[in-house]
């Protein structure tokens, strides 16, 4: 029995910091097109995979229709990308076995990250997967420095010895009081 995978791309036009963000062009290509291309490339390599843009704005669905990108209208009451994903999933005729939330403002997501999520799920099914990377000291230093000017960019995760998430934070966790001694 094949397992159905659905990549949902939540896209909100009414962004506070950058209204119309999904349709902003990056090097001449709309951001939502770039993210949809990532999803499409994953689906080409996974026969039971499909993708859909989830939005509450007709400007985005109109663009998607013109560009040949599958899209679904969601409720205007969704408070987050995750809620928008769930709303889109609930509107599907056939319920997927595995749902991937690929944020519509993530045009630089490497496709191998999504493929690895799929591979991990197939190898060891679980309810939730969150990709994360282990930082070396140079990367940690860069993260700490960038948090000084953009404190809410990026999420850190604390994992146990088996890789299970214990906590997520917009701050840097775990707190390392004297990193020079821990190196």
Language model features by range: what are they?
Residues 10, 101-103, 131-134:
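Short beta-strand segments
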Residues 109-183:
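Conserved core of the sugar-phosphate nucleotidyltransferase
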Residues 58-119:
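Short phosphate-binding loop-to-helix
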Residues 3-55:
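N-terminal glycine-rich phosphate-binding loop and ensuing alpha1 helix
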Residues 1-9, 62, 70:
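Glycine/serine-rich loop-strand microenvironments at binding/catalytic pocket rims
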Residues 48, 94-96, 123-128:
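Short, high-confidence coil segments that cap the C-terminus of an alpha-helix
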Residues 24-27, 73, 145:
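Alpha-helix N-cap and loop-to-helix initiation/capping positions
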């Amino acid at each position: 029995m094949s397992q159905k995978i659905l990549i949902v791309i939540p896209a909100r036009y009414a962004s506070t910091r950058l209204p119309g963000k999904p349709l902003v062009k990056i090097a001449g290509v709309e951001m939502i097109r770039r993210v949809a291309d990532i999803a499409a490339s994953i689906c080409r390599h996974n026969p039971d995979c499909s993708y859909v843009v989830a939005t509450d704005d007709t400007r985005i669905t109109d663009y998607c229709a013109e560009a040949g990108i599958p899209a679904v209208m969601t409720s205007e009451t969704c408070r987050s990308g995750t809620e928008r994903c769930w709303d889109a999933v609930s509107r599907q005729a056939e319920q997927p076995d595995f749902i991937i939330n690929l944020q519509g403002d993530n045009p630089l997501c490497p496709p191998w990250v999504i493929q690895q999520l799929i591979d991990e799920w197939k190898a060891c099914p679980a309810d939730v997967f969150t990709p994360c990377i282990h930082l070396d000291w140079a990367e940690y230093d860069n993260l700490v420095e960038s948090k000084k000017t953009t404190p809410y960019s990026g999420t850190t995760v604390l994992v146990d010895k088996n890789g299970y998430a214990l906590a997520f934070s917009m701050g840097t966790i775990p707190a390392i009081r004297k990193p020079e001694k821990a190196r």
